[in-house]
């Protein structure tokens, strides 16, 4: 019998403890967590530990005499939960990683720092699989991934009955889910009778099995829990189409086990089709459910985890075979460049979370690794533009790491159709100050009104000042972008961000380009976007223009 010690930062409900007598092949699990249920403590299934930093001796002193763990599993969830002295345990230590798309301490870079502080033997990613290459590049040991079914509670769908719903969505709508909320509103505005609510876990699963179509819209291009919950319940899953690096299409086949959409119109078309063809919808739902039960059930994934940790055996694609970027990491890494890439990715990932589609131009860039980093954001349309000679190296790189279908390469001069089309333009910080003015002249035609310029690189104070002066002459205001509902500034030390204020005489050229919704802007950025009609804001806008900082 395998004995597992779990050290968890969050509260664990009584339903997550198996208080019954174990079956022959069941693992014996002991959970150390803050405020465990008294029944679990009494049954010898839990050990209470404090929040924050504490010594592992608290756990070791309370281990049953017949229990020494075969492995210890932790979770990178609360960055302030710091058990110390794990080296006193001689068994393998495993760090479980998920939700890699937040900010602050729980950001991608924050999780990497947290994992590095423990130096675990294995690192298991169950959500945010597209970020595996960052963990490998950061030097974490034995990074692998497995489907997230072990983090959800088991459910067996009841006998099939008549469908109660045509299409449903069960989940959150908030300021953190702007894209999702807009998508749901789009469906309602177009006459789709979708049942939207947030219900308890079990009730949601029951509804999944009673609906002809279950809509999923992940938070930020990740394989979220709802994917596995819907398939476990036997519903037809209609989910946003993710990148190959997400791992979704290494597990399931589109059109066979689930269905996907890439745009609002495609979503409408597929809803209409499957409501008119319920037999095909049911066929896919049955196949998806069976695939999950046969290959990715909680028990099956738990056994895969134990087999790898304790016996060193793991089958493709879970050893990262699905993401070729992992195979082309240059060691030793340049730590400064790595941190810059991480921060740029986190900034653009946060903007990606809020928008249905983003068009980004990387102008004459030298950072091909950054280019392939960004390729896994499914709603980010990337164009890389450079001379024919420079394109050859980037084309080779994109083919090598298998992102060539996710990045459009264009040689200069850039020919645009339909006017200015890029909401964001990204450039590298010039090596020489004399090159800044020339660079701004080059990219000016590519930026529409309210478009954003990202200058990638760590700039000195003098360079920042000079760049800001020249940028203002080009109608670009320096801004700061913060994460939603926070004062956490994104991209600090990795890039400078500017927003384009188009001259009135040029406004007719840019009306077709959609504006980006960004998490949080400085006052100047809000003024330039016209996000507020308050008299104070209008007065401020006039004051700024009259000051000569912006040329009319």
Predicted regions and their residues:
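Class I SAM-dependent methyltransferase Rossmann-like catalytic core
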Residues: 327-356
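Membrane-proximal basic amphipathic "stem/tether" segments
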Residues: 4, 21, 324-330, 489-552
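A short glycine-rich, Lys/Arg-flanked "PGG" loop and its adjoining helix->strand segment in the class I
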Residues: 437-452
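Nucleotide-sugar donor-binding catalytic core of glycosyltransferases
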Residues: 1-62, 66-67, 71-88, 92-254, ...
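C-terminal amphipathic helix plus adjacent low-complexity
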Residues: 269-338, 502-524
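Conserved acidic donor-binding segment of nucleotide-sugar-dependent glycosyltransferases
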Residues: 257-264, 274-278
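Class I SAM-dependent methyltransferase SAM/SAH-binding core
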Residues: 368-405
